[in-house]
UniProtKB/Swiss-Prot annotation:
Belongs to the CEP63 family. This is Deuterosome assembly protein 1. Key structural component of the deuterosome, a structure that promotes de novo centriole amplification in multiciliated cells. Deuterosome-mediated centriole amplification occurs in terminally differentiated multiciliated cells and can generate more than 100 centrioles. Probably sufficient for the specification and formation of the deuterosome inner core. Interacts with CEP152 and recruits PLK4 to activate centriole biogenesis. The keyword Coiled coil applies. Residues 14-59, 85-197, 227-278, 336-399, 454-480, 557-600 form a coiled coil. It comes from Macaca fascicularis. It holds the Pfam family CEP63. The lineage of its organism: Eukaryota, Metazoa, Chordata, Craniata, Vertebrata. GO terms for cellular component: centriole; cytoplasm; deuterosome. GO terms for biological process: cell projection organization; centriole replication; de novo centriole assembly involved in multi-ciliated epithelial cell differentiation; multi-ciliated epithelial cell differentiation.
Length: 603
């Protein structure tokens, strides 16, 4: 029991302390709640104020944007008005310049007329001497005034152009500044949206903190951390507010500056308008003065014409009457001749058209001729090439023929040598036959042999004559080399056969005469005959188609034939060279003509 009482006594003070602590904690929490509620109300009021300020700033920005748009519209309208005014003034200046040029021309005409009138004798013009200098001085003064005004107008035009250029530059600057303002407004709006989001986040955190109080020991630390966060947020909001106020002040100052600039621009435009109005007034005054001057000039011209007519009437009545009539007749004749002149002009135009057509046709014809000439040149070049080829072929053929003829000459020389040898042999045989003793033959009773010998000699003579006739025919006819070769082969065959017959007869005679003749004269004859016949056989064996033994005139005929062939070849070469020269000259002539035509076309 005592222990239980002691325990109750021990526990009761702890519970009392705990209760006291709980009461203190409740008091602290209630106090902090009150503080937090006060702070939250203050923050809410601040947030409301900030929202109002942001709304006011947005309205100000919208108003400024509207003002900028209005300023732009005004600038555009002012530019259009300035352009229209400048165009009008430029047109008026051009018209005034044209009128001024007309006035100067009329003044020059009047001065020339006055110079012509001054040539008239001074006795006829005594009363005009006093009026003309005064009028001339007035006109000169007015012209100088017009010139001075035109110079002033040119200077003012230059000034207005420079002013317009400056206005364009200012407009560009204003447009750039408006774009900068719009960009700044967009950046401010983004900043305001970010700050609104931060405030919404902080406002969402505050009731969560209020609704979730922890009874643990970490509540104090959390509260302090939250308080620090709130303090930092409040300081940031204050800084951003100060920045926004500074920026708003800057924007207001810039707007004031732009308003001042706009006012200055409006004042300048009003000045420009006033200047333009004064310019209009000056132009009107100038036009009035110009009209007055024109009227005065017309009056002066009428007076001068009247005075001239009076003087002409006074000086010569009849000629003055006849001259206008003559002038009228001339005018009527000129008026009547106008259709004729028009017809002549039409004829000239038609002639010009015909000449142009003829020129075009000639150009086409020349082009066709040039094309034909080019074709002819190509054809001639082709013919020249063919002729050169043919000439080369002919040269080759001539060379071949010359080689063949040289070979033929060599063969003819060999045949001449053979013919000489045969001839000497025949003469020798005839001498030998003449030297024989007839008594021995009579005693030997060789009647048949003598007959055979005479017949063989006659045959040889006949064959020699036939060969000479053949050579004469060859000289006269002048056949080709192939026919000559055939004839040479035939004559060679006949000569060879005759030679064989002569050898046979000699052998017979030698066999018959061996017992009754001395041994001294006959062996050399047989040796000579063998020696003379052996080269013929060897030549025939080596040259089977060689020409026969011919006389000395045959070589002359061959030489004559070769000389004629050479002459013909030279004549052909000369003809070919002349033909080639003519073709070259013709081509050069055509080329020169074509180049001249090209030059004429370029000219």
């Amino acid at each position: 029991m005592e222990n239980q009482a002691h325990n109750t006594m021990g526990t009761s003070p702890c519970e009392a302390e705990l209760q006291e602590l709980m009461e203190q904690i409740d008091i602290m929490v209630s106090n902090k709640k009150m503080d937090w509620e006060r702070k939250m109300r203050a923050l809410e009021t601040r947030l409301d104020l900030r929202d109002q300020e942001l709304a006011n700033a947005q309205t100000c920005l919208d108003q400024k944007g509207q003002e900028v748009g209005l300023l732009r519209q005004k600038l555009d309208s002012l530019e259009k008005c300035n352009l229209a005014m400048t165009q009008n003034y430029e047109g008026q200046l051009q018209s005034l310049k044209a009128q001024f040029s007309k006035l100067t021309n009329s003044f020059e005409k009047l001065r020339l007329h006055q110079m012509k009138q001054n040539k008239v004798p001074r006795k006829e013009l005594p009363h005009l001497k006093e009026e003309l200098p005064f009028e001339l001085s007035n006109l000169n003064q007015k012209l100088e005034e017009f010139r001075a005004k035109s110079r002033e107008w040119d200077k003012q035009e230059i000034l207005y152009q420079t002013h317009l250029i400056s206005l364009d530059a200012q407009q560009k600057l204003l447009s750039e500044k408006c774009n900068q303002f719009q960009k700044q407004a967009q950046s401010y709006q983004t900043q305001l949206n970010g700050k609104k989001q931060c405030l919404e986040d902080s406002s969402s955190e505050i009731p969560r903190l209020i609704c979730d109080p922890d009874p643990n020991c970490e509540i104090g630390e959390r509260d302090e951390f939250i308080i620090e966060k709130l303090k930092s947020a409040v300081s940031e909001i204050a800084l951003s507010r100060n920045k926004l106020q500074d920026e708003n002040q800057k924007l207001l100052q810039e707007l004031k500056m732009y308003q001042r600039q706009c006012q200055a621009m409006e004042a300048g435009l009003s000045e420009v308008k006033s200047e333009l109005q004064s310019r209009d007034d000056l132009l009107r005054i100038i036009e009035m003065e110009r009209l007055q001057l024109h009227r005065e000039l017309l009056k002066i011209g009428e007076c001068q014409n009247a005075q001239g007519n009076k003087k002409r009437l006074e000086s010569s009545h009849l000629p003055s009457i006849k001259e206008p009539e003559r002038k009228r007749k001339e005018l009527f004749s000129v008026m009547q001749d106008q259709p004729n002149h028009e017809k002549e002009l039409n004829k000239i135009r038609s002639q010009l058209q015909q000449e142009e057509e003829y020129h075009n046709s000639e150009q086409e014809r020349m082009r066709n001729e040039i094309s034909d000439l080019t074709e002819e040149l190509h054809q001639k070049e082709i013919t020249i090439a063919t002729v050169t080829k043919k000439a080369a072929l002919l040269e080759k053929q001539l060379k071949m023929e010359l080689e063949i003829k040289e070979k033929m000459l060599a063969k003819e020389q060999v045949s001449d040598m053979k013919y000489k040898a045969v001839r000497t042999e025949n003469t020798h045989l005839k001498g030998m036959m003449g030297d024989l003793d007839p008594g021995r033959y009579m005693s030997m009773d060789f009647t048949n042999r003598e007959h055979s010998r005479h017949t063989s000699i006659n045959k040889l003579e006949y064959e020699n004559e036939r060969l000479r006739n053949d050579l004469a025919k060859l000289r006269v006819n002048g056949k080709s080399t192939r026919t000559n070769q055939n004839t040479y082969e035939e004559t060679g065959r006949y000569a060879y056969q005759s030679q064989i017959k002569v050898e046979k007869n000699e052998e017979r005679l030698s066999h018959d005469c061996e017992p009754n003749r001395s041994t001294s004269p006959l062996p050399p004859l047989t040796f000579q005959t063998k020696e003379m016949t052996s080269p013929l056989v060897s030549d025939d064996d080596v040259f089977p188609l060689s020409p026969p033994d011919m006389s000395f005139p045959a070589s002359l005929a061959a030489q004559h034939f070769l000389l004629e062939e050479e002459k013909r070849a030279k004549e052909l070469e000369k003809l070919l060279n002349t033909h080639i020269d003519e073709l070259q000259r013709h081509t050069e002539f055509t080329l020169n003509k074509y180049s001249k035509l090209k030059q004429n076309r370029h000219i």
